[in-house]
């Protein structure tokens, strides 16, 4: 039996962490939000906040031992995972597990698990530890290729390369966008896919697994721009995606929600990536489902029941991006964005802006997917991020 409240320590306090915090507080929980800078979105609604370098093992260990939370919930990839493993051995619960957090923060480890150990279908790929190695690794894959740092987030350091002459620049971009100390890239064949999807997969304490309706999404440079739910898949495609998601999340273990990404290429379903936490493309669930991905994550973490997941006929999201470098922020056009029925705006509360930074998201639902995607696009386009 679950006894509430619980104390949750959140590692990473961005927009996803903010929604996790709100969902946790609705269940009476006490939330400590941690990040590398003060005033991060989740800190604005958390009970307590801590600013630290979460890649520093000593600092991370000290904060967790000081607060003695019931649960540690990583919300970002860049963490001192060796410290999490040590703390887990001491009896502190890490969601989903310290091992899962370590594997999924590195593209090479999650790809090796998926491809070599679990025999899931993935894009053809190779690794390179230098610009020279990258030339030899890319050639057999054919052109174009996609080059990514083994450690990065939100598409940072990712590029599409059409010929050998572009590889050195791609290597430099990958190193500039890399997190951590790994001078290594993954180079993949470029897939001419029909659709990218995220399958939100929920592992529960009793060992059962639930799935949300698939979410279609579009990215630019590896960074989410819009998403919609439910995405249109054939029965066989959905069966394949669920089977692969079940296989890899079972291997990673633990409880909570996982965002499992796939490419759809004709009849093939190809594994792409996995996040062991709520996913940015899943922000659409704040309007599309009776229980958002954040509420589902918390219910699984706290061993609370999930009787049913209901999904709207059609729902969509579109990100709101900054265009300028701004040290203080205001927003124009909110009243226009909210003038249409079944439309919502989330402004994340980030303290500053830079070109291309995600500052909010527009959400819409209705009966027709084409109509709701257009409605979300209009709402997002109405918002201007201006100097405060």
UniProtKB/Swiss-Prot annotation:
Binding positions (ATP): 107, 148, 153-158, 188-191, 196
Enzyme Commission number(s): 6.3.1.21
Gene Ontology MF: a single term: ATP binding
Binding residues annotated for N(1)-(5-phospho-beta-D-ribosyl)glycinamide, in chain numbering: 15-16, 75, 280, 350, 357-358
Keyword tags: ATP-binding, Ligase, Magnesium, Metal-binding, Nucleotide-binding, Purine biosynthesis
GO cellular component, one term: cytosol
Catalytic activity field: N(1)-(5-phospho-beta-D-ribosyl)glycinamide + formate + ATP = N(2)-formyl-N(1)-(5-phospho-beta-D-ribosyl)glycinamide + ADP + phosphate + H(+)
Pathway it works in: Purine metabolism; IMP biosynthesis via de novo pathway; N(2)-formyl-N(1)-(5-phospho-D-ribosyl)glycinamide from N(1)-(5-phospho-D-ribosyl)glycinamide (formate route): step 1/1
Top-level taxon of the source organism: Bacteria
Gene3D superfamilies documented for this protein: 3.40.50.20, ATP-grasp fold, A domain (3.30.1490.20), ATP-grasp fold, B domain (3.30.470.20)
Binding-site list for Mg(2+): 261, 273
Pfam families in UniProt: ATP-grasp, PurT_C, RS_preATP-grasp-like
Residue ranges occupied by any ATP-grasp domain in the UniProt entry: 112-302
Leading EC class: ligase
Single GO BP term: 'de novo' IMP biosynthetic process
Known function: Involved in the de novo purine biosynthesis. Catalyzes the transfer of formate to 5-phospho-ribosyl-glycinamide (GAR), producing 5-phospho-ribosyl-N-formylglycinamide (FGAR). Formate is provided by PurU via hydrolysis of 10-formyl-tetrahydrofolate.
Assembly behavior: Homodimer.
HAMAP family in the record: PurT (MF_01643)
Family, similarity comment: Belongs to the PurK/PurT family.
PANTHER family for this protein: FORMATE-DEPENDENT PHOSPHORIBOSYLGLYCINAMIDE FORMYLTRANSFERASE
Protein's name in the database: Formate-dependent phosphoribosylglycinamide formyltransferase
Organism: Prochlorococcus marinus (strain MIT 9313)
């Amino acid at each position: 039996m679950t006894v509430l409240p619980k104390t949750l320590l959140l590692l990473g306090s961005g927009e996803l962490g903010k929604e996790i915090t709100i969902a946790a507080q609705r269940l009476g929980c006490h939330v400590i939000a941690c990040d590398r800078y003060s005033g991060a979105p989740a800190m604005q609604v958390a009970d307590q906040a801590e600013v630290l370098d979460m890649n520093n093992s000593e600092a991370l260990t000290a904060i967790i031992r000081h607060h003695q939370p019931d649960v540690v919930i990583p919300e970002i990839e860049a963490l001192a995972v060796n410290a999490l493993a040590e703390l887990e051995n001491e009896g502190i619960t890490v969601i989903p597990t310290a091992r899962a957090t370590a594997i999924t923060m590195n593209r090479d480890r999650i790809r090796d698990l998926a491809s070599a150990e679990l025999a899931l279908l993935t894009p053809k790929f190779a690794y390179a530890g230098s610009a020279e190695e990258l030339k030899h690794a890319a050639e057999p894959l054919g052109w174009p290729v996609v080059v990514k740092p083994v450690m990065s987030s939100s598409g940072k350091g990712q590029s599409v390369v059409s010929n050998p002459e572009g590889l050195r620049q791609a290597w430099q971009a990958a190193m500039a966008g890399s997190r951590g100390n790994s001078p290594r890239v993954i180079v993949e064949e470029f897939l001419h896919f029909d659709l990218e999807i995220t399958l939100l997969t929920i592992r529960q304490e009793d060992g059962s697994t639930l799935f949300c309706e698939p979410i279609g999404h579009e990215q630019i440079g590896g960074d989410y721009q819009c998403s919609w739910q439910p995405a249109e898949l054939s029965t066989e495609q959905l069966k394949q995606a669920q089977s692969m998601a079940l296989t890899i999340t079972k291997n990673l273990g633990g409880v909570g929600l996982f965002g499992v990404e796939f490419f759809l290429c004709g009849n093939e379903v190809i594994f792409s990536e996995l996040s062991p936490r709520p996913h940015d493309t899943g922000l659409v669930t704040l309007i599309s489902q009776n229980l958002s991905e954040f509420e589902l994550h918390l219910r699984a973490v706290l061993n609370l029941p999930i009787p049913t997941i209901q999904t709207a006929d059609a729902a969509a999201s579109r990100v709101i991006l900054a265009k300028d470098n701004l040290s203080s922020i205001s927003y124009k056009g909110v009243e226009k964005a909210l003038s249409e029925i079944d439309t919502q705006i989330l402004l994340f509360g980030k303290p500053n802006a830079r070109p291309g930074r995600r500052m909010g998201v527009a959400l819409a639902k209705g009966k027709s997917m084409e109509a709701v995607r257009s409605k979300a696009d209009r709402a997002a386009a109405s918002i201007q991020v201006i100097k405060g």
